[in-house]
Amino acid sequence: MAQQTIEQPKLIHTKKGALSYKEKTLIMGILNVTPDSFSDGGKYDSTERALLHAAKMAEEGAHIIDIGGESTRPGASLVSADEEMSRVIPAIERITSELDVQISIDTYKASVADEAVKAGASIINDIWGAKGDPDMASVAAAHSVPIILMHNRKERNYNDLIPDMLADLMESVKIAAEAGVSDENMILDPGIGFAKSYEDNLAVMNKLEVFSGLGYPLLLATSRKRFIGRVLDLPPEERAEGTGATVCLGVQKGCDIVRVHDVKQIARMTKMMDAMLNKGGAHHG
């Protein structure tokens, strides 16, 4: 008789309850409370507008709202921790008081993450994979919150792209573990669009199963990014279909969470993908 493998529960535990990614792909809706993000800068930088947009995304199928107060687009101006907090904290407090939705704080500054979690955020999303701020992993450990460790590096000096990326990500895992973050509180992100050329981004998309095979939940953040614009020759606001294609490939290759702007359309795509892949173990009626 074949030995049975014990199936992982596939749960992300947060202080707002557990998120299961076993039956469905989780949707993270992007909320930039910044004046200069590449795709929606300035649209949601008042607390009231931020709340309305978060509510709309939650209604359209977002399980997590990812709030960022500093644009990460190439060439964006740097923002002080105080300025970043003045943007994100009021939005987090307002959304937490009005909506029953998980909030992730998109920051690489430990002080911002700390205040954001105190204000109601339940996940930390760090584009520097706990390598940008030496205190970030400790903040995640102190609050016992999940942390998304994204692949990034200062230079594109790869010897061999995929193995180098895997080594970089495992370095982030090691930093987090040494600070006291538990394995089940780590989520990985291959960092599409960060320290990668156009060709690199396409190559990573083609090898996503290698990253989902590491045993951690995998987040894919491709929404409206430049490599999609280059393939389709379209501006950011016209990249929903291209984003959808990347999401469908990602789901097929084992991604568990997708971070997107166009929640309504993408949620329909992931629901269809999940049904075809029989993700919940029983076909959806």
Name the predicted role of every residue range.
Residues I12, T25-M28, R49-L51, K56:
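N-terminal structural segment of carbohydrate-active enzymes
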Residues S20, L26-E48:
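N-terminal binding-site loop/beta-alpha segment at the start of enzyme catalytic domains
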Residues L52-G68:
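Catalytic domains of carbohydrate-active enzymes, especially glycoside hydrolases
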Residues I6-E7, T14-K15, S39-H53, T72-R94, ...:
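Active-site-adjacent loop and "lid" segments of alpha/beta metabolic enzymes
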Residues A2-E23:
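N-terminal carbohydrate-binding accessory modules
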Residues L31, G61, I124:
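Conserved hydrophobic/aromatic pocket- or pore-lining residues that grip, position, or stack substrates
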